[in-house]
Amino acid sequence: MPNLPGSSDSTQRHQRNPGTDELVCSSTKPNAAQENADTELAQEKHPQLLSPQTDIPPVCSQPNVSFAQCWDQNFFLDAALTGQNSMTLLGVFDLPNSHMNLTETLSSQLGLEPSQNAFGQGSFDPFVPSSEPSVHSTDNPWPSLPTQLAFQPTNNNTSSLALLGPDPEQLSTLPSSWTGPLDEWPPLDLGQDFAALLSPTYQAFEATPRHTHAHAHQPPRATRHITSQQSPEPYVQVHSTAKIVDRFLVPIAPKPILVERDGPVSGASLPSNPPTALSSTGTRKRKRFNKADRERVNQMRKLGSCFRCRMYKENCDPGLPCKNCMRVQVTRRTFFGPCIRIKWEEVHTFRAGDGDLGQIRATLQTFQWTLGGQVKSIDVQWPFRDDKVKPPILSIECQQFLPKHEHVAEEYSVAGQAYKILLPPWACSNTKAASKKVEAFVRQCQAPLEEEIRHTLNDPILLLTLDEARRYRNETGSKLVATALEIYAGAMMNSRYPASTESDIFGVVDQLHTPYFFDKVPLPPQLTCQIQIMVAQVMLDKQKNALKRLQERALSKNRHKVWYECYLTIFILLATIELVYQVQLRFVKAKQGVSDRNATNLSYVTQYMIEEWEESILTLVGLFHCVMNGGLPFTQSWEDGGENHRLTELDDKALVYVRSLKAEIEQRRGELIALRNRRGRWRYEQPLAAICQLFLPSQDGDKGEGRAAPPS
């Protein structure tokens, strides 16, 4: 049996037993069936104090409980107890009021001078140690430390006693003669009679994080409660998430107690009346949803919260506008944007389908290669209109295949006249290696493609904004605007067919040069399809990254400082949608009057992609109005030193662009309103049909022109 404090050998150091160092128990394990039954009953009474059960194997025959010298980091008493975060809780006990004179013994052991006002009424009132360390007798080797005692009367017969210690920072400033190695500190002598006087009411060891501070070498551990049913049931409560550095034993009652060497102290049996002053403040278990609540949650997960509810972290509802937005429609003071739901995964700015294949999301085909067929490496270029541009070259390994359902003829219509070109069945044989080459090829073509886009634009608003976006990207290094421009260039690349640099590589003679292929030799349709699908896959990845960054900017608290970057990005993405919209329309018109085998597939895929683009346009426009807090930036004053200039912090070149665009919009206001009011299947066929909505109030009567541009 180990030495107990208060015995003749109480001043001797407690020797650790390797066999019981990790687990110390006081009695044999009770009957499992009875324990489970009692535990279920206890869970019904006190569900907030329980967690999964843990078996307690018997080790010791004598009932005992372990106290710790808890001078370690990450072990603090809640500030609500003492008014500070610098004390450590060693234990809490219920004592009969008739034996409160034991506090004098504790005070002398801990170097305290008891105060007559130490007994608070209804709250803990700690002893205040003197500023100077008290002098101890040589009989007590316990270090002189600024320790405290706290009491709380619970009724007329009993009171609660809390044992408090200093924080680790105070220990680090004490003389070395006080601190010393922890293993050499003697146990605190409480006396034999102290444990016997503990109230036999209930007992529960509870390990719950209080003010837990991060520690680089000691992550927080999970809370565990270990319960059992035996009597008598004294109550002891210890709050700890720290490593126990030493321990000694005090006999209390025949109850199993678990002490972990490297974790919190845990114990058994729930109290019939849980304590309130030092009870756990852990997170309560969330109530289970009923069937109606689960259906509502699942529905909202599919729909998503509106922009305002996401920004203010409110519970949204399926309505549009939702109840929260309708509730503040008249009284709102800070957010004036529309109620929209942004499904980022449903925003599409690129032409990802293939009408010939009948695929909404085109994938690479597989072919049956000819046995022993020759592999050729061909050079491909993109047909730039500017003869001064030196186009990059893409080298692809191709092989002949056996056509099954694949058509090797290229059919198109020019001015109502149908043309048909028979091309040999060749396709890329190593698509994995070719995909990497295509990605590098797109990067090399970025600058000339931007120039090609500029040469195709005739509208001043589009030209001004494209030049400003390129300048902003080059001077600020904005990855968001850069990615949007890359998507724009990729859409331009897929708007035309690539061509071979050689005229007779596939046996195609020079006479096959046609205006439809920009006077270039066409490639086999399967090879052209493969290259365009690889470009689309690269652009879809970039689109995902751009939308993710745009979401972060839109929901940030500094939207008034990033609105210009968001505006340029949304403008370029809308211009990209307009481009692919027009390209798809041109492709459909080119197939009219042609004996095309895929007329049904083409119609279905085209209609599906058009609906996606139209929904994406509405989403991006609504997002811009949310970023701008419902305001219209190009109807405001942008004079030097004005409120807009001060809040947005735009540079001089950006201000020049804003003022120039404002003048252009005011001059063409009637034209822009007519474009916005277009309806029908091809309502975004004209340039600026989608972009004009960034400059005009919505058609539902939104009066956003009178508010300042940046959100407050």
Curated annotation (Swiss-Prot):
DNA-binding region in chain numbering: 306-339
Residue ranges that the Swiss-Prot or TrEMBL entry lists as coiled coil: 530-560
Entry's localization field: Nucleus
GO cellular component: nucleus
InterPro entries: Fungal_sec-metab_reg_TF, Zn2-C6_fun-type_DNA-bd_sf
Biased composition (Polar residues): 1-10, 25-36, 131-145, 269-282
SUPFAM superfamilies listed in its UniProt record: Zn2/Cys6 DNA-binding domain
Disordered: region residues: 1-43, 115-145, 264-294
Misc remark: Trichothecenes are sesquiterpenoid toxins that act by inhibiting protein biosynthesis.
Purpose: Transcriptional regulator that may regulate the expression of the satratoxin biosynthesis SC3 cluster, one of the 3 clusters involved in the biosynthesis of satratoxins, trichothecene mycotoxins that are associated with human food poisonings.
Protein name: Satratoxin biosynthesis SC3 cluster transcription factor SAT20
Gene that this sequence comes from: SAT20
